[in-house]
């Protein structure tokens, strides 16, 4: 099997987990929801640790963004039903601890930022390599994690939607929020 894992992520090591499921799988801690609702539906529990598939990496989560989309999923506010049980979190930063079959360009131990479809409110998350990027040296996971949702939304709003060009003036409404803060900084460039 071509799955590669970091040496410190074996079942017997407490750096990743010290528990296994009844069928031998590794268990991790996660915040999960079993039904939609307010913040009272967030449950901290043991869940099976995911295994990366083709084109995916397993990331040890060191920072996770909390975005309005996570709240909307939790409340059931999207037009499509929230698939429960569900682990929110679509913005993470951490360290690659395993790579799936066929993955190239990501080594175990690489610091990364990623936008997985969900699952970021956990100790580990599987993410597609297409949505995962190395973190430059000197930047902490906490500093970089908000770039995925809020930063990219600000870039897309200014560059793609507004087609802002040098020398133009822009009004950013709600500039105190995450996306607005990024948009103001980007507009100055």
Predicted regions and their residues:
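Mid-domain Rossmann-like dinucleotide-binding core that forms the NAD(H)/NADP(H) cofactor-binding site
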Residues: 107, 147-189
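Cytochrome P450 core scaffold surrounding the K-helix E-X-X-R motif
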Residues: 69-75
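Short pre-catalytic strand/loop immediately N-terminal to key active-site residues, enriched for Gly-Thr
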Residues: 84, 139-147
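Glycine-rich beta-strand-centered segment in the early N-terminal region that forms part
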Residues: 48-66, 77-119
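A structural motif shared across PLP-dependent enzymes of the aminotransferase-like
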Residues: 116-129
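Residue-level detector of alpha-helix initiation sites
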Residues: 68, 139, 176-179
